[in-house]
Swiss-Prot record:
The gene is pafA. This is Pup--protein ligase. Its EC number is 6.3.1.19. Coiled coil: none annotated. The keyword Ligase applies. It comes from Streptomyces griseus subsp. griseus (strain JCM 4626 / CBS 651.72 / NBRC 13350 / KCC S-0626 / ISP 5235). The keyword Nucleotide-binding applies. Pfam families: Pup_ligase.
Length: 453
C-alpha cells in the first residue's frame, strides 16, 4: 500500500500538586481539565474541528486521537497539535483552580508509566489491506516491534530490587502477550480487535500498542515511518528471514534492559540474535526494497537515513550522533549530565524527577521543551503548522469531511453527532452520511449536508 492511513492515540498521565503535596485526585483534576470541553461538547468524549477525537479514557487519562493522516510528517504535526490542545486545557484548569482558591499546579505527562506502576499507552494505527493473511503479517512484524524500541524508545529509569537502572522502553515491562484482542487486561504487542473504521471488506486496521509515547518529532517520524516500510514489504510479499522469537515477552524486556543492543535473544529456530542484528535485517531489506521499487521520497529517505544512523550509533556506542533525534538517548544524556554534576546514583529520587519532567507537555516547564528552546532537538514540523493543526483537519483524508461538518454545525449552532465513519444532524430528518472510505476527502453527500444547515 503506497498510500496508507495513519493515526496515533496518546493517553496522558495527569497529576496535581499543592505546594509540592498532592491535593486533588486524578479524577478531580481530569474534571477540571475537561470542564471547558464538557461546557461546549456536553460530553468528555468529543470530536474536534481538526477531525481529531479528545476524550477521558479509563482511569482519568486524557486521550487524544489524531485525525486520519496519509503521510507521516502530517501525522507527527497533528500529534503535536494534540499536545498543544491539552496544554491549553491544562492552563485553563490551573486558572480555574486558582479562582477557587486552590493553589495547585496541574501536570500532564506524555509518558507511559506512573509512580504506582500503572501503564497507559501510545497506540499506532495503520490501515492494511484485508486480503493479506493477518497471521503472516503478525509473525513478521512481532520481531521487528520487539526490537524497534532500540530506535524509538522513550527511555525510563526503572526501579528494581537491585536499585534503579536505565531502560530503553517504558512499555516493555507492561507487555504480556504477542497478539490479543484486549488492550488493557493482557497488553499485547498487536491488538487484533477488528474495528477498521472503514470498509471492512477491503481494509483492516492494524492496532500496535507496544510503542512508547514520543516527545521528539524525529523519533516519532522514525517509529511510524520504519513500521510503514516493513508493512509495505510484507504486503508486497517480500521474502523475509524467519526471525520468530522463542519468547517475545521475555525478549522485549531483555532488549529494553540493554542499552548496547548487543544482548542475544533466542529465536524459535534455536538460533540467537541481538536486537541490533534483528533490526539490521529489516533495515537492509527496507533499503533494498525502496531501491527496487523506486519509491524514494524525501520522507522515506529521511526515515532510512535516521534508521541506519541510529543502529550504527547504538552499535558503536557513539550516542552523540543521535542525541538530538532519539528520545531515549536525549533523556539518557540529560540524566547522565545531571548525575555527573551532582555526583548521584541512578536511584536518587531527583533522577526519577528528571525522567518524569522530560515528558511534561507544558512548554515553559517540561525538560524536553527546555532542550528544544536551546536548539538541542532536531525538528521536522514548524510551530505554525502545529498551530494550524489545532483547528484545521488534514486536507487529503476523510478527516477533512468530518472537520468541515463539525465547524459548520457549530457555527450554525446545530445539534449533531459524529464518530469516525458517521456524520449526523440531530434534526427531525435525522440526516446521516456514512463515510466508509478514509482516503476520500471530497464527498457530494457531505457538501449537501453542510449546505443544508
Amino acid at each position: 500500500m503506497d498510500r496508507r492511513i495513519f493515526g496515533l492515540e496518546n493517553e496522558y498521565g495527569v497529576t496535581c500538586t499543592f505546594r509540592g503535596q498532592r491535593r486533588l485526585s486524578p479524577d478531580e483534576v481530569a474534571r477540571y481539565l475537561f470542564r471547558r470541553v464538557v461546557s461546549w461538547g456536553r460530553s468528555s468524549n468529543v470530536f474536534l474541528r481538526n477531525g481529531a477525537r479528545l476524550y477521558l479514557d479509563v482511569g482519568s487519562h486524557p486521550e487524544y486521537a489524531t485525525p486520519e493522516c496519509d503521510n507521516v510528517t502530517e501525522l507527527v504535526t497533528h500529534d503535536k497539535a494534540g499536545e498543544r490542545i491539552l496544554e491549553g486545557l491544562l492552563v485553563d484548569a490551573e486558572r480555574r483552580l486558582h479562582e477557587e482558591g486552590i493553589a495547585g499546579d496541574v501536570y500532564l505527562f506524555k509518558n507511559n508509566t506512573d509512580s504506582a506502576g500503572n501503564s497507559y499507552g501510545c497506540h499506532e494505527n495503520y490501515l492494511v489491506a484485508r486480503h493479506g493473511e493477518f497471521s503472516r503479517l503478525a509473525d513478521i512484524l512481532i520481531p521487528f516491534l520487539v526490537t524497534r524500541q532500540l530506535i524509538c524508545g522513550a527511555g525510563k529509569v526503572l526501579q528494581t530490587p537491585r536499585g534503579a537502572v536505565y531502560c530503553v522502553s517504558q512499555r516493555a515491562e507492561h507487555i504480556w502477550e504477542g497478539v490479543s484482542s484486549a488492550t488493557t487486561r493482557s497488553r499485547p504487542i498487536i491488538n487484533t480487535r477488528d474495528e477498521p473504521h472503514a470498509d471492512a471488506e477491503r481494509y483492516r486496521r492494524l492496532h500496535v500498542i507496544v510503542g512508547d509515547s514520543n516527545m521528539s518529532e524525529t523519533t516519532m517520524l522514525l517509529k511510524v515511518g520504519a513500521t510503514d516500510l516493513v508493512l509495505r514489504m510484507i504486503e508486497a510479499g517480500t521474502v523475509m528471514r524467519d526471525l520468530t522469537l522463542e519468547n517475545p515477552i521475555r525478549a522485549i524486556r531483555e532488549v529494553s534492559h540493554d542499552l548496547t543492543g548487543q544482548r542475544k535473544v533466542r529465536l524459535a529456530s534455536g538460533r540467537e540474535a541481538s536486537a541490533i542484528e534483528v533490526q539490521r535485517e529489516y533495515y537492509e531489506k527496507a533499503v533494498d526494497f525502496v531501491e527496487r521499487r523506486g519509491i524514494r521520497t524525501g520522507t522515506v529517505d529521511q526515515v532510512l537515513e535516521l534508521w541506519g544512523r541510529t543502529l550504527d550509533a547504538v552499535e558503536a556506542q557513539d550516542l552523540d550522533r543521535i542525541d538530538t533525534e532519539i528520545d531515549w538517548v536525549m533523556k539518557y544524556k540529560l540524566i547522565e549530565r545531571y548525575r555527573a554534576k551532582h555526583n548521584m546514583t541512578m536511584s536518587n529520587p531527583r533522577v526519577a524527577q528528571i525522567d518524569l519532567a522530560y515528558h511534561d507537555i507544558h512548554r515553559r516547564r517540561g525538560l524536553f521543551y527546555l532542550l528544544e528552546r536551546k536548539g538541542q532537538t532536531a525538528r521536522i514540523c514548524n510551530d505554525l503548522k502545529i498551530f494550524e493543526g489545532k483547528s484545521v483537519p488534514p486536507q487529503t483524508t476523510r478527516a477533512r469531511l468530518r472537520g468541515d461538518f463539525i465547524r459548520r454545525a457549530q457555527e450554525q449552532r446545530r445539534d449533531f453527532t459524529v464518530d469516525w465513519v458517521h456524520l449526523k444532524l440531530n434534526d427531525q430528518a435525522q440526516r446521516t452520511v456514512l463515510c466508509k472510505d478514509p482516503f476520500r476527502s471530497v464527498d457530494e453527500r457531505v457538501e449537501k449536508l453542510i449546505a443544508g444547515m
